Amino acid sequence: MRHPPPTRDKLPATNTIRASDMPPIPDEIKQFGRAHLPRSVLDKGHLIAFLYRQRFSKPRIPDTPSFDDEGDRYFSSRMPKARIYLEYGSGGSTIVAAKSRVRFKTVDSDPFFLRAVENKITTEFGSSNGDFVYCNIGMTELWGVPIFKRPSATRCIRWKRYPLAPWVNHDASFLPDLVLIDGRFRVACALTTIKYLTNKVSFEILVDDYGDRAEYREIEEYAELSSMQGRMAVFKPKSAVHLDAIDRAIETYSLDYH
């Protein structure tokens, strides 16, 4: 039986678990009703329909990511060269990683979608070198966006855990040379990755939708924008990163789920 969400003062030290460790969807979730949702959500009938499909239908996981043509070509050509791969936001990109047999870790805020990705990989490949990490940021809608967007104390704690999710109980041997930022909290995820890879000489961070988002420019303070592949930005390490400054920026952008 799934336990109710923890109260503000009882949040566990970590809020990330492997997708394979998640309990089955309980019958109680069928009790999910209108009384539990705020009016702002009730006004969105499409969201109610999405939540139902999210829980009771089998999502179709694509074989390739939904990048534009240039981004897709770059990602597809770069993956076979990677030794260790990290991504924020699972989906077709995870399938590409599994096919490449690269060691990988994927983080997602939608447990139902993440479970479907893992099941597809297990079914098609039997096993993988992957680690599937679910980070609970609260109930989510399409693309793993939090439904409840007001930054309450409890939500802030949860949101700040998302960029840190792949680094909790970190295996020192897991130092990715290729990182895709295509989930939530993209600036904070990029900056957190840069911080943890400070001593790594060579790596690439790919940030999708970069060309459309002026707020993502903060990343350029801490990494070199090497090229644009369509709407995808390719970053490489700077020679020096001021950790105090990057910590302050992470604190700020950990509350921005875009």
Short names for language-model regions:
Residues 65, 83, 87, 179-183:
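Short, charged/polar micro-motifs that form catalytic or ligand-binding hotspots
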Residues 1-66:
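Membrane-proximal basic amphipathic "stem/tether" segments
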Residues 113-122, 141-144, 214-219, 235-239:
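Short, charged, surface-exposed secondary-structure boundary motifs
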Residues 69-142:
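SAM cofactor-binding core of SAM-dependent methyltransferases
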Residues 70-74, 91-93, 161-169, 191-192, ...:
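A generic local structural motif
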Residues 168-258:
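C-terminal substrate-binding/active-site "lid" region of AdoMet-derived donor-dependent transferases
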Residues 119-173:
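S-adenosyl-L-methionine
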Residues 50-65, 76-80, 144-164:
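Glycine-rich phosphate-binding "P-loop"
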